[in-house]
């Protein structure tokens, strides 16, 4: 409401699934086209597919026909927009309406004679500060990754097939959370910086990078461990030690107001002195309803950490001699005076 007052908005309408969930609570199917509308008095109208959800943080719940005889309609955007526009017919004083410029359907904008304002930047900023219910879901997703790494350490050995490992890890994550996942990623390749699983067997001497990002009720985890297929070499251990040294520094200096860009630059210089390997990517990013959110630990952005941020730190070193590299990724919550480590499980190569 404070943001609406600052932007002098009479109404906010969101169409992205993440933002509908952020405002109204339910997580709808990826193929659906719900809408949520918040007016200047704080009243929320939800337009849901087919039937009203069992629970929603909405003052009014309307529905549109997303399916006809179980067939998914292709014109859902128009159908949900028509329902909302009909509900708004009696509204007065609508002059400035906030919408997501990247995705708001023309069916909606062409039916309203108002000035439209892009609300997406403000929504992404609001999403940075995680509420307790959001943290609970992120912690649940992280618990799934803990179990996946425990299993990976049991089954990774010379000759194991990447597809078999992928299937077992996915099953372990589902059993851990007790329901279907709402997302599943990211990297499941052995002797590779990352990528989807292949019909390939792990070989002795290789390193297996697991960058895991299961989603629980819309909220993502995103952390990484590297596991040696057998005994790690001296070069692999030297690279691991250089990477592991990054985390105490992060935990010592990050607090509200700390520059994420400066942190990236410092770690980049740390890893330049590694005896083997090159650091080739970002240092990390925020996460929540989307795997990559602010803050960006990256030279391309200039942002500062804020209390309530949940973010990743993922230093890595890559070289053919390492077969093919090491990446370790922790997840943190920014508190009032520092950080809380959310991924307090082993990071060793074996």
Predicted segments, located by residue:
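Active-site neighborhoods and metal-handling regions in enzymes and metal-associated proteins
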Residues: 1-350
């Amino acid at each position: 409401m404070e943001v609406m007052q600052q932007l002098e908005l009479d109404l906010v309408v969101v169409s992205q699934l993440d933002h509908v969930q952020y405002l109204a609570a339910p997580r709808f199917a990826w193929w659906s086209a719900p809408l949520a509308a918040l007016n200047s008095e704080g009243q929320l109208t939800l337009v849901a597919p087919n039937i009203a959800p069992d629970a929603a943080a909405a003052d009014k719940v309307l529905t549109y026909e997303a399916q006809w005889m179980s067939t998914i309609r292709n014109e859902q955007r128009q159908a949900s927009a028509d329902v909302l526009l009909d509900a708004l017919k009696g509204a007065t004083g609508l002059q400035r309406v906030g919408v997501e410029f990247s995705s708001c359907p023309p069916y909606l904008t062409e039916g309203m004679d108002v000035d439209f304002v892009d609300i997406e930047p403000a929504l992404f900023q609001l999403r940075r500060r995680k509420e307790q219910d959001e943290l609970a879901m992120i912690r649940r997703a992280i618990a799934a990754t803990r179990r996946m790494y425990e299993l990976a350490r049991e089954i990774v050995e010379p000759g194991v097939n990447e597809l078999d490992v992928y299937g077992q890890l996915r099953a372990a994550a589902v059993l851990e959370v007790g329901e279907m996942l709402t997302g599943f990623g990211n990297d499941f390749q052995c002797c590779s910086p990352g990528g989807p699983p292949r019909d390939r067997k792990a070989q002795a001497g290789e390193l297996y990078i697991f960058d895991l990002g299961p989603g629980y009720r819309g909220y993502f985890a995103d952390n990484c461990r590297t596991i040696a297929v057998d005994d790690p070499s001296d070069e692999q251990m030297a690279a691991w030690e250089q990477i592991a040294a990054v985390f105490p520094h992060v935990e010592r200096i990050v607090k509200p107001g700390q520059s994420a860009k400066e942190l990236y630059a410092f770690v980049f210089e740390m890893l330049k002195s590694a005896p083997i390997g090159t650091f080739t990517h970002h240092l990390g990013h925020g996460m929540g309803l989307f795997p990559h959110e602010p803050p960006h630990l990256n030279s391309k952005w200039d942002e500062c950490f804020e209390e309530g941020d949940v973010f990743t730190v993922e230093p890595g070193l890559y070289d053919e001699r390492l077969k093919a590299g090491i990446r370790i990724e922790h997840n943190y919550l920014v508190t009032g005076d520092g950080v809380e480590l959310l991924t307090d499980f082993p990071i060793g190569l074996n």
